[in-house]
Design a protein with these regions (language model features):
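Terminal low-complexity segments of carbohydrate-biosynthetic enzymes
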Residues: 1-21, 25-29, 34-37, 41, ...
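Active-site-proximal specificity loops/subdomain of glycosyltransferases
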Residues: 2, 9-76, 89-100
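Alpha-helix N-cap/helix-initiation motif
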Residues: 54-61, 219-227
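Basic, glycine-/proline-tolerant helical and adjacent loop/strand elements
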Residues: 82
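Conserved donor-nucleotide/metal-binding helix-loop-beta segment in metal-dependent transferases, i.e.
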Residues: 86-135
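Short active-site alpha-helical segment characteristic of glycosyltransferases
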Residues: 230-233
Length: 345
């Protein structure tokens, strides 16, 4: 990115911050190093995988976002990938305020126990509950995640991108739904917001599932299913603790990713397939694991739930693939760091 593009991006960021009366804080890699070094000296536990090796090698992409989630003091966190921009209203042509819509989703109740066929009954412009919806369930529960969607380039895995290289998402549906309790979903980290206090410990986006060497070599910041894994953890924990997860608006516009544009869509997808193939295969067994996972009554907050999932991963999935033993170690390191930071707040 040249200086002109950086200046333009900074102007867009500042305008967004002013619109929502927010402050900005720029954190460099050196700032992150100092913070994690200080945190390590305070910790009484020693892990096989350190937080520094997890988040700083390299300090880009999902590692940066995960570090931000860890140290943020905000109640709500809104996160977008660098290749998305605000989508436009198809009627008026005006840019949609994705931040405001995410916050509206999080601040309104969710209905995970009984599906309302008229979309989100707690949305400001909703017509409410349909006939037959139990009155005892209409109060809803706290929403801990708002999962947005995208227009433009679909968030495909590599095999699908190979067979559908020219496919584009063009249909805009102005709706929000609560994902029912017991149902899992594939989270996309490109457009998501969450309640940091209630579900934040689940939002580690860098584990290296099926590609554990990338954790240490610095050749990749994550694998293609790391954000999906975070979503599976978050949904299971939300169900266990009695919270809700919403999906739908806001939309963002997703442009061509560099890996898909340098040598053409198919060539980029073929290159991605080399790193995605194993994680995608493992996902076929990971999803049933989460579908049958049951947390104990002793797990009463997201930190405890995440640590308990880490132990289950180590006990039940490491026989499936050696990378899961390291995934469990990463999760344990993250859970302890989260507790250490937030116990001091």
């Amino acid at each position: 990115m040249d200086e002109e593009e950086q200046d333009e991006q900074q102007k867009v960021l500042q305008n967004l911050l002013l619109l929502h009366e927010l402050n900005s804080e720029v954190v460099t890699k050196r700032d992150a190093e100092k913070f994690l070094e200080a945190l390590a000296t305070k910790s009484s536990k020693r892990h096989s995988i350190t937080l520094s090796s997890l988040l700083l090698n390299p300090f880009v992409g999902s590692a940066c976002r995960s570090f931000g989630f860890l140290v943020s003091k905000a109640r709500y966190v809104v996160s977008f990938l660098e290749d998305v921009v605000p989508a436009k209203d198809l009627g008026s042509g005006e840019l949609l305020d994705a931040v405001e819509q995410h916050l509206a989703n999080l601040r309104s109740k969710a209905t995970p126990y009984y599906f309302n066929t008229l979309y989100d009954p707690h949305r400001a412009d909703s017509v409410g509950f349909v006939r037959g919806y139990p009155f005892s369930l209409r109060l809803g529960v706290t929403t801990v995640m708002s999962h947005g969607l995208s227009l433009g380039l679909p968030d495909y895995d590599a095999p699908t991108a190979i067979v559908k290289p020219h496919e584009r998402t063009q249909r805009y549906v102005d709706a929000v739904v609560t994902i029912p309790k017991g149902s899992l979903f594939p989270l996309s980290g490109s457009n998501v917001a969450f309640d940091r206090r209630l579900i934040g410990p689940c939002m580690l986006l860098r584990l290296g599932i099926g590609g554990q060497d990338s954790l240490f070599s610095g050749s990749s910041s994550s694998t293609s299913v790391d954000d999906v894994w975070a979503g599976l953890c978050a949904k299971v924990v939300a169900d266990h603790l009695g919270f809700g997860v919403k999906t739908g608006v806001p939309y963002v516009w997703r442009g061509p990713d560099s890996s898909f544009s340098s040598n053409g869509a198919v060539a980029g997808a073929l290159a991605s397939l080399k790193t995605e193939f194993k994680p995608l295969l493992l996902l076929e067994d990971v999803v049933p694991f989460f579908q049958t996972l049951r947390l104990s009554k002793n797990a009463t907050n997201a930190e405890d739930c995440y640590a308990e999932i880490a132990r289950m991963v180590k006990g039940k999935l490491r026989g499936l693939d050696p990378s899961f033993e390291r995934v469990a170690a990463v999760m344990e390191t993250w859970a302890d760091a989260w507790k250490a930071i937030n116990s001091a707040v």
